[in-house]
Amino acid sequence: MAESLFYQLAAAGVQGLTPYQPGKPIEELEREYGVRGAVKLASNENPLGPSPMAIDAIYGVLGESGRYPDGNGFALKTALSQCLGIPANQITLGNGSSDLLEFAARVLISPEHEVIYSQYCFALYPLLIQILGAKGHAVPAKGFGHDLEAMVKAVNSQTRLVYIANPNNPTGTWLHSDELEAFLAALPEHVLVVLDEAYYEYVNEAQYPYSLAWMSRYPNLMITRTFSKIYGLAGLRIGYGVSHPDLADLMNRVRPPFNVNSLALAAATAALQDHDHLQRSRKVNQAGMAQLTMAFTALGLDYIPSVANFVTVDVKQSGDKVYENLLRHGVIVRPMTGYGLPRHVRVTVGREEENARFIQVLETVLEEFR
């Protein structure tokens, strides 16, 4: 059979791979359940959407869609360089920050190597390592977040990479500046730390690290960020990495040509200039987080305190069943069973009316289980 032959020919890491499962799209829910006006609070998107300046920039380049994009992303790299105060040759662009997570692994990881990440980590980390045929080491979490001391102890001569998310997805926990820098200082130079800061713009904590200041001190540090979250450009897929220039050069060697499209490049460059949209997004998130967590407390539900734009809550029963019942009422959240949290669901902070709809439906669903 042709199908079974392909399964036999597939690389060992791919044969046993379970594909990454994104949040269910609204269109799919409405097709399956026949509901209208569904609310999606599953994928940590900005409920305000993109900056108007980003939308204008997209329209401005639509007419040039017949041309290939700037493969080096000069304009965006220049804007990022000015915004972040770092040289452009330390910046690598990706089709979402997931590209950068992969590029680093492809540059450094061979099957004999090991990669370390935390127990409750972004699902893509172990998937990437499995594809490459290397060994992944999930270090047990501490308080739903990273146990940095245990992660240092897990490092050996075969370790090449450590993934750290700050804030962490899916739990929303975060690492203080002093503990994270102590972790960096304790690692041998042959181990690259990929610091995933997809949600850093949402953090409002005095002890949250300004990691870019560490770049000259720790050449084995790479920072990844995205325009998919607070900048509201998830549908265009664009992110960036900041690293030592030599690592940036190596990642550009494995980066596919024209991996970032013209619309994304223009939108991201414009979005960097719209500070008002960024502030509005933060305010909406802070208000929405308070709205959700107050409701959880009123319902007697425990939640993991989060500094990001989502919160993970213990629904005191099967998270999968609660998720399915929420779907029937037209609300999409994210079940956490696949992350080892079978009684939890993760909820993106939405607009006030979206949060209110979710809270109302959650009350109904929980009552159905009583």
From Swiss-Prot:
UniProt keyword annotations, A-Z: Amino-acid biosynthesis, Aminotransferase, Histidine biosynthesis, Pyridoxal phosphate, Transferase
Catalytic activity from the UniProt record: L-histidinol phosphate + 2-oxoglutarate = 3-(imidazol-4-yl)-2-oxopropyl phosphate + L-glutamate
Any one GO molecular-function label of the UniProt entry: histidinol-phosphate transaminase activity
Needed co-factor(s): pyridoxal 5'-phosphate
Primary enzyme class: transferase
Modified residues (N6-(pyridoxal phosphate)lysine): K229
Assembly: Homodimer.
PANTHER family, per the entry: HISTIDINOL-PHOSPHATE AMINOTRANSFERASE, HISTIDINOL-PHOSPHATE AMINOTRANSFERASE 2
Protein name per UniProt: Histidinol-phosphate aminotransferase 1
Gene from which this protein is expressed: hisC1
